[in-house]
């Protein structure tokens, strides 16, 4: 007999992670109806990170401010931060001075230590929701669960979650497909219990796929659905908007996990394009289209969304 336990996220109220709340804007121009998703743009974790980085520079104009890795996956925002004197670095130097920011995706514990040892003042802007996933993974590892992280192994958030769990267990796997789990199958079968956490920006379909497979090989499966509410609500609402749209425009970086997943979901619903900003809009794809839906990933600032809308309204 399989024992399956589901524990769903019990954090803030369901709408609180979302920064932008708006009615769908319906514009009529050139016989086109444009509808903007309510849940489009910065989530609260991204908004917090960007605003804090800018505030740090304002309060410390003479200090060097560094971000380890891109603060968020949006080129326009990174360029803006660079223009303010906030530099992105990809490795921690042996020696440094000033402030070093840990981005919203989080980092491995040894990276925090390395930053401090280098002489930097450390500012941790790991998203609170990501912190919760790390803590759940640690809790499972400490309680002798075989930990399965549903996520992309090369994504910085997942790498940080795994690094935290690895401190307490050598039984940790990362997967979004059955093929990625199969090498661990015998170890999972031999173990009494399996615990699951999820990358905050993953698709529910990936979680279900992994869980269904685990149910066939594990004796007990404990599932923490740690997909953040902003991701879940963004995907749900965008699917509903797609049902009444001939074309969906998804705005945000191609490197953004939550946005690529969003575009992937919508492509199964209606014609969909994924653009980083208004410069990538092609007038040919908008020809003979009456109903256009627009959504945006968690790393998209409002100014970029507005530029996309205005360009479509202006007939490109």
Q: Where are the language model's segments positioned?
A:
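N-terminal start and proteolytic maturation junction detector
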Residues: 4-6
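The feature marks the mature, well-folded catalytic cores of soluble enzymes
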Residues: 21-316
């Amino acid at each position: 007999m399989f024992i399956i336990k589901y524990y769903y996220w019990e954090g803030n109220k369901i709408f609180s992670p979302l920064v932008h709340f708006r009615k769908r804007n319906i514009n009529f121009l050139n016989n086109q109806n444009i509808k903007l998703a309510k849940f489009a743009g910065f989530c609260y974790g991204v908004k917090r990170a960007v605003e804090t980085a800018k505030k740090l520079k304002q309060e410390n104009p003479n200090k060097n401010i560094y971000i380890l890795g891109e603060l968020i996956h949006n080129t326009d925002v990174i360029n803006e931060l660079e223009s303010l004197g906030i530099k992105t670095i990809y490795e921690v130097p042996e020696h440094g001075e000033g402030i070093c920011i840990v981005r919203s995706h989080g980092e491995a514990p040894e990276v925090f230590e390395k930053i401090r040892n280098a002489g930097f003042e450390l500012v941790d802007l790991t998203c609170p929701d990501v912190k919760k996933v790390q803590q759940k993974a640690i809790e499972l590892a400490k309680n002798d669960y075989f930990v399965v992280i549903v996520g992309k192994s090369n994504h910085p958030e997942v790498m940080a979650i795994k690094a935290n769990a690895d401190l307490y267990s050598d039984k940790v796997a990362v997967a979004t497909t059955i093929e990625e789990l199969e090498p661990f199958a015998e170890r999972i079968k031999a173990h009494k219990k399996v615990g699951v956490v999820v990358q905050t920006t993953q698709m529910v379909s990936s979680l279900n796929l992994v869980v269904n497979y685990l149910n066939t090989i594990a004796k007990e499966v404990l599932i923490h659905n740690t997909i953040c509410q902003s991701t879940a609500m963004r995907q749900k609402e965008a699917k509903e908007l797609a049902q009444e749209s001939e074309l969906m425009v998804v705005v945000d970086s191609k490197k953004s996990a939550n946005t690529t997943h969003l575009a992937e979901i919508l492509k199964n619903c209606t014609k969909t394009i994924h653009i980083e900003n208004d410069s990538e809009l092609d007038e040919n794809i908008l020809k003979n289209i009456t109903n256009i839906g627009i959504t945006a990933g968690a790393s998209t600032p409002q100014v970029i969304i507005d530029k996309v809308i205005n360009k479509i309204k202006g007939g490109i």
